[in-house]
Structures are given as structure tokens and as C-alpha cells.
Amino acid sequence: MATLQKILVVEDEPDIQAIVKLALELTGGYTVEVCATGYEAIERALMFAPDLILLDVMMPGLDGPATLHALRKIPQCSDTPIIFLTARVQPHDLERYRALGVRDVIAKPFNPMSLAQTLQTMWSTYDRATDA
């Protein structure tokens, strides 16, 4: 797997968008694209070809699970790691997310300044799993 460089953040809350974008750019040096809806995520994914997608679960319109399903139909996103951002982290929720094909889940609220390190740790785990 390549180096983690480009991250697509799909989040409907403007404050969370801004904080996540700033934190990932400053602490991780990543190129970050942000969008607010599942529909925008599909368009951006086609143009941006992200290495990783952070996807809010509860959004108006096309929610996280429906967006994930649509993204998986895009050839350049079929294997892209997708991490759900959500406050819903009960065991039954996590089982459902895994069944959908989500790589990981980050619980809200989270520390934005440690987000880049968390993602890098997750990415190295994906890299080892791919090499195995």
C-alpha cells in the first residue's frame, strides 16, 4: 500500500469539518478535501482519488452507510479504506459497521490533534495486512 497522503473528509457539521481539516494538514501534512454530503463525497472521490476516507455516519440525505455503498461502486474507491466517524459506538453498531465493510471506527468526540497519529497508526496496520 502506498503512503497515506490524500484524505477525503465527509462531515455535515462545518465546525467539525474545519477542525479535522486543519488538524490533519498541520499535524499530519496531509492533503485534505472536505465535503458535507454523501452526494458530494461521490463527486469528490471521482476527482480527488483519496487514499483514505473519513465518513460521518449520520448525515442528512445520503447517510454514511449509503454513501459507503455508493463509493464502493467507484473503481478507484473499491479498496479505499473507509473509517466511520460516529457517536454511535455500541457493540451492535460496530458489528453493523464491520458488516458494511468499514475498515475502522473513530468515536466522536475525538481529539483532533491526535487524529493524524491515530490515522497513521491505522494506516500502518492496513499496510501490514496488505503485505501479509
At which residue positions do the language-model features occur?
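Two-component/phosphorelay signaling modules centered on CheY-like receiver
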Residues: 14-33
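Short, glycine/charged-rich "phosphate-handling" switch motifs in NTP-dependent
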Residues: 103
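Conserved acidic carboxylate
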Residues: 11
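C-terminal output helix
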Residues: 110-119
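Receiver (REC) domain active-site loop signature in two-component systems and cognate sites
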Residues: 59
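Acidic, metal-coordinating helix/loop segments flanking the phosphotransfer/catalytic sites
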Residues: 34-52, 69
